[in-house]
């Protein structure tokens, strides 16, 4: 096997094109087999095999700094940087992290798994590299929906303004968890649909740049003409309007083509985007056939049949059911998600009430302030978000919702410890943050039935409310154990014989179990 000969990035540079093609197939098989045993992110990594191999053949990590946005597409990076043998412990206690991890390897620089941050990291690191006069490049890999986040645009704007030497590899698979929602993604989709025109343009650009002495000058002279042509033949490439050079799109599964583009980008004196088109879930039929999320993430599964069709479970399932029931009775209720309609349990609501469902992309801050605007206009918005991602929009929840005493409901899924999702996904801050928001009422259901009651009560309140519930299964209880959400209920009573007892144990939420 070629894979057994790859113990570090340098080994990739010794391989022939034919060996690289074999290696890509072997890596896909390895990832499917590993994730089938432990669970993990599948579709994103199957789509990032060739671009990762090209990256490590062109750039010399860790001398060159390779940054991964979100990080769930970095399994191939881990495999080729010496961690292949640790994959049986993927996402296990004390084992291999599901995201880049600084403690694991010198090849990992950032380890958060929240999206749209990498361009800001890249700007800062490129500033430090330039000041030190170091002969190293900074490469930022972003995509899989992350370009819908506002922070990515802030980083892009500052890169263009500063002129820092950063190579941005845009992995465009058209999706995050679900098909990406943004005008940018629509523009990129139109580019994807005209590969003939785009490939001709890309080859012409590279030929001009290779002309001795006059290549860069000729390119500069053609930019005005290209801009005019774009207005007619393709959507404006807004990257260049921000001062960031753009090249592509290229076939992200053609290692040689991606390598060639990256080598030219590495020589460019400024920020540059290399746009590659990839297929999420490539090479594994169950992932390719999964129209909803291309097996973005998967539990333990049988390789022959693939994971069972995903459906919300436990508290998330109870929330999904409650939202549809509430939506039937209250036409003013709207649901908002930040690129996670399936994981937050809103697919059924989306199907039943498409005009009252809003997927804003990876944009939690916008989601919360948009909900504030809806509430001002008389609607009753529900923002469904993981607890860990709610922290990204605390300022908006505090000022735009709380200060205005607006009736916005936050459905905070994955509250508490989330196990194999890792430290960046633990929902341990939402309770402390919600307590600081003016007028906030916090609900914590202890059963599936109580979640439904609390959602209805939260929507009846005149100010902000949060319903927080954990990952995993929910208790199923009878009506005798379901009270009103803001009333304590005595579930058990045990006093000494003949005595009243002077100790009361108060449990909230899942602690009731």
Segments from the language model and where they lie:
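A glycine-rich helix N-cap at a beta->alpha junction
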Residues: 84-100, 161-178, 196-199, 358, ...
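Short acidic, glycine/serine/threonine-rich loops at helix termini
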Residues: 76-82, 123, 147-156, 178-183, ...
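N-terminal amphipathic, basic-rich helices that act as targeting or association modules
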Residues: 1-81, 238-262, 267-278
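Cofactor-binding active-site loop characterized by glycine-rich and histidine/acidic residues
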Residues: 41-162, 332-333, 337-338, 346-347
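A short alpha/beta connector and helix-capping loop motif
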Residues: 149-171, 181, 185-194, 380, ...
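Glycine-/acidic-rich phosphate or pyrophosphate-binding loops and their flanking alpha/beta elements
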Residues: 260-263, 293, 314-329, 345-351, ...
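Short, acidic loop-beta-alpha module within alpha/beta folds
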Residues: 116-127, 347-348, 365, 369-372, ...
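Long, well-ordered, tryptophan-enriched scaffold segments
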Residues: 173-319
């Amino acid at each position: 096997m070629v894979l057994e000969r790859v113990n570090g990035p340098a080994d990739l540079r010794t391989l022939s094109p034919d060996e690289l093609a074999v290696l890509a197939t072997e890596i896909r098989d390895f990832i499917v087999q590993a994730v089938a045993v432990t669970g993990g992110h599948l579709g994103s990594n199957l789509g990032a095999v060739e671009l990762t191999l090209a990256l490590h053949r062109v750039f010399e990590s860790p001398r060159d700094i390779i940054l991964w946005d979100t990080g769930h597409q970095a399994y191939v990076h881990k495999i080729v940087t010496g961690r292949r043998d640790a994959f049986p412990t993927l996402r296990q206690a004390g084992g291999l992290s599901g995201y880049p991890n600084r403690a694991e390897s010198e090849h990992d620089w950032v380890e958060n798994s929240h999206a749209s941050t990498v361009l800001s990291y890249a700007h800062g690191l490129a500033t430090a590299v330039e000041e030190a006069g170091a002969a190293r490049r900074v490469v930022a890999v972003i995509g899989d929906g992350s370009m819908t986040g506002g922070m990515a645009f802030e980083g892009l704007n500052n890169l263009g303004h500063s002129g820092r030497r950063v190579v941005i590899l845009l992995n465009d698979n058209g999706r995050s968890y679900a098909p990406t929602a943004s005008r940018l993604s629509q523009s990129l989709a139109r580019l994807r649909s005209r590969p003939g025109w785009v490939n001709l343009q890309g080859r012409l650009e590279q030929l001009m740049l290779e002309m001795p002495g006059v290549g860069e000058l000729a390119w500069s002279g053609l930019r005005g003409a290209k801009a005019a042509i774009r207005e007619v033949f393709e959507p404006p490439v807004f990257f260049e309007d921000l001062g960031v050079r753009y090249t592509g799109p290229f076939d992200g599964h053609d290692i040689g083509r991606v390598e060639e583009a990256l080598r030219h980008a590495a020589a460019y004196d400024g920020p540059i985007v290399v746009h590659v088109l990839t297929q999420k879930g490539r090479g594994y039929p169950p992932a390719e056939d999964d129209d909803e999320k291309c097996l973005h993430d998967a539990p333990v599964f049988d390789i022959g049949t693939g994971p069972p069709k995903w459906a919300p479970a436990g508290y998330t399932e109870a929330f999904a059911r409650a939202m549809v029931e509430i939506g039937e009775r209250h036409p003013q209720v709207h649901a908002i998600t930040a690129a996670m309609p399936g994981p937050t349990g809103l697919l059924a609501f989306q199907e039943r009430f498409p005009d009252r469902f809003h997927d804003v992309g990876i944009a939690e801050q916008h989601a919360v302030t948009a909900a504030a605007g809806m509430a001002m206009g008389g609607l009753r918005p529900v923002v469904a978000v993981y607890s860990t991602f709610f922290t990204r929009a605390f300022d908006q929840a505090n000022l735009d919702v709380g200060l205005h005493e607006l009736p916005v409901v936050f459905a905070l899924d994955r509250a508490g410890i989330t196990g194999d999702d890792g430290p960046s996904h633990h929902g341990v801050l939402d309770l402390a943050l919600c307590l600081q928001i003016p007028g906030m009422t916090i609900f914590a259901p202890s059963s599936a039935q109580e979640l439904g009651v609390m959602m209805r009560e939260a929507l009846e309140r005149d100010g902000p409310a949060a319903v927080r519930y954990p990952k995993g299964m929910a208790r199923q209880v009878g009506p005798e154990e379901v009270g009103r959400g803001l009333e304590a209920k005595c579930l058990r009573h045990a006093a000494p014989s003949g005595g009243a007892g002077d100790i009361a144990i108060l449990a909230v939420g899942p602690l009731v179990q």
